[in-house]
């Protein structure tokens, strides 16, 4: 099985989170952007989304991030790495 790619688009209003297996979109979810949330809070949110759609951490082999909210990029990147163990590709990479 091909590992899943976690995708996160950090927008001013929403975070759009998705997972791809090759070119197939497996799920998409949205969270309200909240600049006051911590890395741990975002990690909990990601874990909840994975649980909601029936995916485990070990199924993710990569992470791609786009962002227009630089002050959240680091926290969300670290949260994604903590959950998936995968290195990210995104702003500054």
What is the predicted function of each stretch?
Residues 53-93:
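Short beta-strand-loop/turn "lid" adjacent to the catalytic site in phosphate-handling enzymes
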């Amino acid at each position: 099985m091909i590992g899943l790619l976690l995708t996160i688009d950090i927008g001013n209003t929403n975070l759009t989170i998705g997972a791809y297996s090759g070119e197939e979109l497996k799920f998409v979810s949205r969270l309200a952007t909240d600049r006051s949330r911590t890395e741990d809070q975002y990690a909990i949110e990601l874990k909840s989304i994975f649980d909601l759609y029936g995916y485990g951490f070990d199924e993710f082999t990569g992470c791609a991030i786009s962002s227009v909210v630089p002050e959240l990029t680091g926290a969300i990147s670290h949260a994604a790495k903590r959950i998936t163990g995968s290195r990210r590709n995104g702003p500054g990479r």
